[in-house]
Amino acid sequence: MRRPKKYESGEATQYISRRAALRKLQLSLNDFRRLCILKGVYPREPKHRRRAQKGSSEIKVLYHTKDIRFLLHESIVWTLRDYKIFAKKSNRDRAIKDFRNLKRRLALFPEIKLDHIVKERYPTFIDALKDLDDCLTLLFLFSTFPSLHLIPREQSNLCRRLTIEFLHYVIASKSLRKVFISIKGYYFQAEIKGQKVTWIVPHYYPFKPQSRQEVDFKVMSIFVEFYTIMLGFTNFRLFHGLNLAYPPQFPSSVLQDSEESLKDEASFVSDRIAALNFELLRTDKVQEDEEELDIDMELLEQDGDSKRIIKMKQEAQEVSRLRTLFKGLKFFINREVPREPLVILIRSFGGKVSWDSSIFAGSTYDEADETITHQIVDRPSISTQYISRDYIQPQWVFDCVNQRQLLPTNKYFIGETLPPHLSPFVDSKRDSYIPPEEKALLDPSLIETHAQSDDDSEDEAEKEEEEAVDQELLDAQLQLAYQQETAEYKKYGGPDGVNEDEEDPEDDDEDDDEEEEEEELDEKTKRLQEEKQKMSVQSGKVHKVNKRQLHKAEVDEHRLQARMVKPRHRNLFRKLIREKQTKEKEEWLLRKKRRTHEANEKEARKTAKREARKEAAAAAAKASKLGK
């Protein structure tokens, strides 16, 4: 039997370097990168790099040999090789100026088909929905790009079309759950088929070209190439699940004969689709969304009243209320407000929305409409205002969605300082410190309790000040009365004018008899109490907890745990302890900042009230002088 040589088995055969993979596949580096992105193959980090690299200490890019064998059987490899042949032949035709043959070759340009790869990577529809976050974020980003060197106009237009179709599904299904505005853009979260899908829509700023190539647009465009196919399949399935026609179409009532529609019907329809303000054509006339919700609630009611079922019932009721949050409300968006995010929100929750027709196509009513209930404004003042509507800032819409109720509009009027816009994407179990404003998102009743506690603390402080003044006056009066009483007592010998030193001899006998009777009664009561104590349960003593001893016991237990950790797990244990300590330190710092901030605010309110009282007292005194 032949003895196996070193690096012929084990970890050395499980990995292959990138150079060896290129030789095996007979591809260039760019084609190999493209193939790996499309197939979802990525580099691996071995446990023992020196063994995996067959004794070499040089750091190389390594892949699993199984992954490279998997790529060998891919049909795209042949298409990528055909690109080389196509480039050589087309360059030859250009060199000899055979334009007829060149035109024929360009018509037969080899195209990569990615349908089978999408089906291979996502065997079920739920798998595709789980991986939809990055897909949507990247496509929404590319939909805002102009035509660049490595990003053709067709690609950005395709991204725009697919993202608009997805937004139409979100509006029609009313599956939006959370929203948030940040520096990066608008965060949206929808619940589709039980899966939470989160994506970012960037802010609408003019594109600024970069002087340096910091971002590799070529690699990103390869991802976009795959994600467009994936989102196309997903949209098709989602639209047919709601019985909507795909590609999106309008009913005949929207396509009325007008000058715009008669000139170019395709552009007219595409503009109205991009407006997100019209209902799409359905393949059936009955809407089954509400019926499905009722069926689910009936199924929940059939089960037992366990905690999980009760929680699911509450969540289902909240979601049903959220779906009709803006029902019956009419909004008008001003020019300075970003249109698309607000249209998505308002229409997803049953509201009606419009804007100035000169901004974008698809407005349904003008600003002068008397039935408008809310006008969204993002400027310090406005010239003409209607009494029949509320003029609010855009944050009101986002906060209403996150708190799942219509908030009062007085804090969001024009020119008002807005309340903090808190993120709903916070895990209360994972994050140790949660500010009171964020707790109010989970429980709106905490807003009132927090405000009441602040008011109560201020009232208590005022009462304490008033009581302190009254107590000083009372002490002074009591001291004066005590001095007068002692003076009279010394002068007249007692309250009735009788001196205590003069005593009657008859009273001594009566006092002795009374003392004997009291002693007998005391003995009887003592006996009764002893008998009761024997029969009754005695009250327990209060056990005082020594915090120092408890802390010492915890420290000793922690040291014992650290000793018992295995040597190979010791670094991991230290890392976990370090993370825990940093988290506790951050929590302590945040609580300290919060305490100092609240103390400063409280002191500022107190000083403001004192100054107001002084001013009021001075004004009253001045008025009384003038009256005299």
UniProtKB/Swiss-Prot annotation:
Source organism superkingdom: Eukaryota
Q: Which CDD domains match?
A: BRCT_pescadillo_like
Q: Which UniProt keywords apply?
A: Coiled coil, Nucleus, Phosphoprotein, Ribosome biogenesis, rRNA processing
List the residue ranges of the region (Disordered).
438-470, 488-567, 593-628
Q: Where are the annotated coiled coils located?
A: 590-626
What is a biological process (GO) this protein takes part in? maturation of LSU-rRNA from tricistronic rRNA transcript (SSU-rRNA, 5.8S rRNA, LSU-rRNA)
Domain named BRCT: residues: 321-414
The protein's name is Pescadillo homolog
Organism from which the protein derives: Drosophila yakuba (Fruit fly)
Q: What's the source species' lineage?
A: Eukaryota, Metazoa, Ecdysozoa, Arthropoda, Hexapoda
